[in-house]
Amino acid sequence: MAAVQFAAAGVLTGLLALATLASCNTDGDILYKQRLAWEDPNNVLQSWDPTLANPCTWFHVTCNLNNSVIRVDLGKAGISGPLLPDLGALESLQYMELFGNSLNGSIPSTLGNLTDLISLDLWDNLLTGPIPTTLGSISTLRYLRLYENNLTGPIPPSFGNLTSLLELKLHRNSLSGSIPASLGNIKSLQFLKLNENMLTGTVPLEVLSLVVVGNLTELNIARNNLDGTVRSSGLRVTAVIQDMRIA
């Protein structure tokens, strides 16, 4: 009986090892496919070799102890091209740092599947189209920075579900519609920058109340098409409201 149990334990250990290896290879396959979709004039992705056992030895990639990818650091790397929907299958990814490049096309809705994601930095690119509502399902997200792109459409009300968020920076896009009152649910929010868009309507009281009941220290909604009245006496917030009537 002991021998049978020992053999069973060995089989289980082997299966777990194979599962971990398969996961690593999956991450590598995804990233290599993304590499092929990008232009890389500076050869920063030269080390992304699909023949290796896993991507953990690649430059600009960080893995956890299980050899799963948790971080991709390609800020200001000179790359261009689209973001593939396959990126949403990087199950352990915590940091996606792709700012300051020439990425184009839309933000894949599949990024909402990255349930461990802490930071999504896609600022200063050439991204177009709407912001996926699915990003509002990433409860672990603390930094969402999509500013200085060409994004259009509304701010997803689903962002009100991001109750761990510290920074929401969507400025210098072409976003339209109203500011969702649901953003007032994010009591952890410290920085909210929505300036230089095409937002309309009034600033919801739920959002303004974050100054009192939350941790908001910077609110920038300048250079939109907002209207209404804002009163801010004794508030801790730096409110830059150039295009609003202030009573």
Swiss-Prot record:
- Provide the transmembrane region boundaries: none
For whether the record's keyword set contains Magnesium, the answer is no
Which GO cellular component does the record give, naming just one?
external side of plasma membrane
Sugar attachment sites: N66, N104, N113, N150, N161, N215
Example GO biological process = positive regulation of plant-type hypersensitive response
Induction conditions: Induced in stalks during infection with G.zeae.
| InterPro entries linked | LRR_dom_sf (IPR032675), LRR_N_plant-typ (IPR013210), LRR_R13L4/SHOC2-like (IPR055414)
- Record's keyword terms, sorted: Glycoprotein, Leucine-rich repeat, Receptor, Repeat, Signal
Name where the LRR repeats lie: 90-114, 116-138, 139-161, 162-186, 188-210, 213-237
| Signal peptide span | 1-24
Specify one Pfam family. Answer: LRR_14
Subunit text: Interacts with WAK17 isoform 1; the interaction is direct.
The entry's function note states: Contributes to activation of the hypersensitive response, a form of programmed cell death, upon fungal infection. May sense the presence of fungal material and relay the signal to WAK17 isoform 1.
- Mind telling me what this protein is named? Disease resistance protein BAK6
Q: Which organism is it from?
A: Zea mays (Maize)
Gene name per UniProt: BAK6
